[in-house]
Amino acid sequence: MALMGVQLVVSLLAVSIMQRMAPHLSFARWLLCNGSLLKFRHPSEGELCALAGKQIPKTSRRDRRQNGHGESKPLTVPKDIDLHLESTPVNVMDALVLRFFVEYQWLIDFAVYATGIYLFTEGYYSVVDASKEVNIASIWCVLTVLFCLRTLYLLMSHYFLSEEGGERSVCLAFGFLSLLIAMLVLVVREDYLEFGLEPGFTSLFDNFEVFARKQGYEWSVPFTKLSVKLGLAVICAFIGALLAFPGLRLAQTHLDAVQMNADRPMIQILLHMSFLSPLVIIVMWIKPIARDFLGNAPMGKTSVTLLSSSAFSSVRLWTIVVLCVLRLLLTRYHLQAYLNLAQKWVEQMKKEAGRIAAIDIQRKVTRIFCYLTVVTLQYLIPILLVLFSTLALKSLGDFSWGLGAETPGVTPAPIIPSSTPPPVPGPEDDEDMEDMEEDIQATVAHLTELFSALRALLTPIFFRGIFAFLTWWVAACQLISSLFGIYFHQYLMHN
């Protein structure tokens, strides 16, 4: 039986630390409350009246009786008043009232601990021969991907529950567009898009056919392949709908961040590289452009091998990780660009004629800050999806970080509960304990057979195809939605 050993101990220790330290030490809370982000405080009615050159109206009892319900008329001020919002650093007390703050803190902290577990596991496998142990890091990576999708679903459900139907229509439109694109991508041959889905499905179906025949079942492989691809296309449509608003928001914060750093050309270059990083990820899975070109680069009348096949796979993994780290390092610029929307809205209001209620100004400025964690999740989750899909691809797909010859990786071993000696029974319950031992042995034998069958079905070839396609698809969805967002904010918003 395979034991988790050191990995299980470290994993349980990480879970315990995460649970106990969350109220005291949280990376997610530090990201928003380290003093680098500045929020804008909404003006009070007294400040607005002073800028408008009048006093705060006092309502008499007679006016309240005439209004019927004791409500005073809303205070209005001219839109072109000389209003300048006061900025203050975001602190912990401010962050506690933000929308989806609990979900944000839990997800980001879990991703940080998952990264630590992954780094420990990689170091552990480089020192110890742990081929018979379960790769706990891959489980953490898969869980992080699932939790990211769950959080995006919570955000999207918020749009569907709102009274306005515009956000719901956008999600549905991107979902149907993603469904069409996914069906087109899934019929492209492996000679052009080298996900490895076909070899992965072939391995899965062949192994499952052997398993089904042993159980006495007959099934049709062509029908199963078609149904699996249709199901995968539906999942792609769902992911595309989830990534619609994160891409649109990324486009807006990118444009504002570039404008905000107009006097810092190096930051602008990094922002543009970060924005175009999904395009680089997409190109790296196009075989004629990436692998074939680097494997047989034309040099006059001859061709030169710049990278071997295994070295290219490692370079691709490293490139994706570096691009994700770059985008994570630029998080603060995007978040500050979003917070600056409050001052940007005030400047736009000054150009308009007429009057506006003071409560509307206060509500608009406050609403921008209240959705800071939503915008942070929309920026970070696509990055985490790509990053942890790539890490899972490396671990479960038996890839290597080195540029030399590809070494066989670690295939997840079946998780089998270890049997511990039962306590010594008394004379009165010998028969009950014997029956219990027989039940436990039967359960262990059944689980052993089940996990052995799953290990034979889910091979590294299958995991390579699934996680390579997931990584590529998330990057493609974000590129499509963000480019549409650039077009929307640059042209449609000004017309």
From Swiss-Prot:
It is a multi-pass membrane protein. Residues 121-135, 189-227, 287-305, 389-465 are cytoplasmic. GO terms for cellular component: membrane. Pfam families: Tmemb_161AB (PF10268). It is found in: Membrane. The chain crosses the membrane at residues 100-120, 136-156, 168-188, 228-248, 266-286, 306-326, 368-388, 466-486. It comes from the Eukaryota. This is Transmembrane protein 161A. The lineage of its organism: Eukaryota, Metazoa, Chordata, Craniata, Vertebrata.
